């Protein structure tokens, strides 16, 4: 592995590890709850905004889609991870720094969720946001990494005047 890509690789492992540890902590804490306590581990309410930590499981892709296709979905996810990792490895030197950061975030999130599927057979979600009656589907840090990485990549592609510098 070239030394230039080592920080990216270490960041990828660090982010995936943070995701796995956060899920482990939530699962361990939820096992300590008594059957008579509330289902959430933490709550913060500010006006009409609320943030809760509630463990839940997702057997499908985003929003539980394709839950009935577990094996094809896992194969697809692994292929996407391998494809992105290969692309990042081959094109590393020519990629714009923002593109490398975005792809690293996306890969870290994908690794975090695939690790869950391999370990538990489903993804552990635990972050829940709501505002008034609007409720966002529960998610985890891996999902946040994927979303932030995707937004960074789209923003960079959109605002980069020289598109050649992105890829």
Curated annotation (Swiss-Prot):
Spell out the Pfam families in the cross-references.
Peptidase_A8 (PF01252)
Please list the reactions this protein catalyses: Release of signal peptides from bacterial membrane prolipoproteins. Hydrolyzes -Xaa-Yaa-Zaa-|-(S,diacylglyceryl)Cys-, in which Xaa is hydrophobic (preferably Leu), and Yaa (Ala or Ser) and Zaa (Gly or Ala) have small, neutral side chains
GO MF terms here are: aspartic-type endopeptidase activity
Subcellular location, record wording: Cell inner membrane
* Top-tier EC class: hydrolase
User: Catalytic center at which residues?
Assistant: 125, 143
Membrane as a keyword of this entry, yes or no, is yes
Keywords assigned? Aspartyl protease, Cell inner membrane, Cell membrane, Hydrolase, Membrane, Protease, Transmembrane, Transmembrane helix
* GO process terms (BP): proteolysis
Q: How does it sit in the membrane?
A: Multi-pass membrane protein
Q: What is its main location?
A: membrane
Query: Which pathway does it operate in?
Result: Protein modification; lipoprotein biosynthesis (signal peptide cleavage)
Q: What is its EC number?
A: 3.4.23.36
A GO CC annotation recorded here is: plasma membrane
Q: Does the keyword Transmembrane helix apply?
A: yes
Q: Which ranges does the record mark as transmembrane? A: 8-28, 46-66, 68-88, 101-121, 139-159
Q: Which PROSITE patterns match?
A: SPASE_II (PS00855)
User: Which family does the entry's similarity section mention?
Assistant: Belongs to the peptidase A8 family.
What function does the entry list? This protein specifically catalyzes the removal of signal peptides from prolipoproteins.
> Which protein are we looking at?
Lipoprotein signal peptidase
Tell me the classification of the organism that encodes this protein.
Bacteria, Pseudomonadati, Chlamydiota, Chlamydiia, Chlamydiales
């Amino acid at each position: 592995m070239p030394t230039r890509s080592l920080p990216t690789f270490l960041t990828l492992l660090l982010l995936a590890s943070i995701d796995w540890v956060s899920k482990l902590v939530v699962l361990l804490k939820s096992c300590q709850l008594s059957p008579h306590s509330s289902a959430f581990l933490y709550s913060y309410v500010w006006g009409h905004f609320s943030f809760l930590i509630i463990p839940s499981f997702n057997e499908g892709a985003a929003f539980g889609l394709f839950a009935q296709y577990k094996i094809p979905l896992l194969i697809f996810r692994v292929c996407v991870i391998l494809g992105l990792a290969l692309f990042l490895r081959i094109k590393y030197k020519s990629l714009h720094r923002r593109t490398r950061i975005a792809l690293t975030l996306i890969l870290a999130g994908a690794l975090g969720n695939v690790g869950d599927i391999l370990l538990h057979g489903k993804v552990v979600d635990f972050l829940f946001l709501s505002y008034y009656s609007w409720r966002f589907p529960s998610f985890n840090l891996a999902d946040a990494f994927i979303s932030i990485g995707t937004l960074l990549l789209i923003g960079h592609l959109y605002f980069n005047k020289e598109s050649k510098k992105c890829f």
